[in-house]
A protein has these predicted regions:
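Extracellular glycan-modifying ectodomains
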Residues: 1-236
Length: 236
């Protein structure tokens, strides 16, 4: 279905789909969702979209602990899953990049932030490599805006952001030829949602869930699509 013509689910519609399936006893389709934020409604949207595409199995999505992305990826290896969804956001690489921890920001911390992100990126790559040996993976890169961390005007390119993007590019280069890891294209997201149309600060502060519902529905549909459509074999 053409993305521009696609009708996206409301939260109520997603919950109705999930609840209908709970009444049926069918073979399970287990998925693990690794993220550092509280996934809440994004889990519901992903589960509902995936459920509609595989009606003969009951989709179950489990998630891990708050604020421990890398630990959650490792946790996924304790059980067997049909698919592993990994969603990185900047606070997963350094909590100081998140709204909840940004009150103590000082520009003198920039060097330390970069070093922390670099170490976490290396650890992330290692965990993804390990997990991919046993389960197919969908990897989504940071989708939310970061707050200005420079005295420069916000429309000018910042050194920190350039280095952060470079580290994510390193992850992309590592897995771009992998038949086990699919990666959501950040530019595809940009075509449909601006950074600030994705973010709900009030929800993040109250519940640890940082997304607007329309964007969560859009992202859940993408996640479901990557699971039900196998990655093409490399070189073909």
């Amino acid at each position: 279905l053409n993305t521009y013509e696609r009708k996206y689910l409301t939260l109520l519609e997603a919950l109705e789909i999930i609840n209908r399936k709970k009444e049926e006893t069918q073979r399970e389709f287990p998925v693990f969702y690794a993220a550092g934020y509280t996934p809440l409604h994004l889990l519901s949207f992903t589960q509902a979209y995936l459920q509609t595409s595989i009606p003969h199995e009951r989709v179950i999505i489990k998630s891990g602990l708050f604020n421990d992305l890398i630990g959650n990826i490792s946790m996924s290896k304790r059980e067997e899953y049909r698919h592993l969804l990994i969603h990185i956001e900047w606070p997963d690489l350094d909590p100081r990049l998140g709204l909840r921890s940004s009150s103590g920001w000082d520009l003198s911390m920039l060097t330390d932030v970069i070093e922390t992100i670099e170490k976490k990126t290396h650890a992330l790559i290692a965990e993804v490599e390990s997990a991919a040996a046993s389960v197919p993976i969908t990897l989504c890169f940071p989708t939310l805006p970061i707050f200005p961390m420079s005295y420069q005007p916000p429309y000018l390119l910042q050194s920190l952001r350039t280095k952060m993007d470079g580290l994510m590019h390193r992850v992309q280069q590592r897995f771009i030829d992998s038949s086990r890891v699919q990666m959501i294209d950040p530019y595809w997201l940009d075509l449909h949602y601006t950074g600030y149309d994705r973010y709900d600060a009030e929800s993040e502060i109250s519940f640890g869930f940082p997304f607007t519902l329309p964007f969560a529905s859009f992202l859940g549909a993408l996640f479901a699509d990557t699971i039900r459509v196998p990655a093409p074999k490399k070189g073909l």
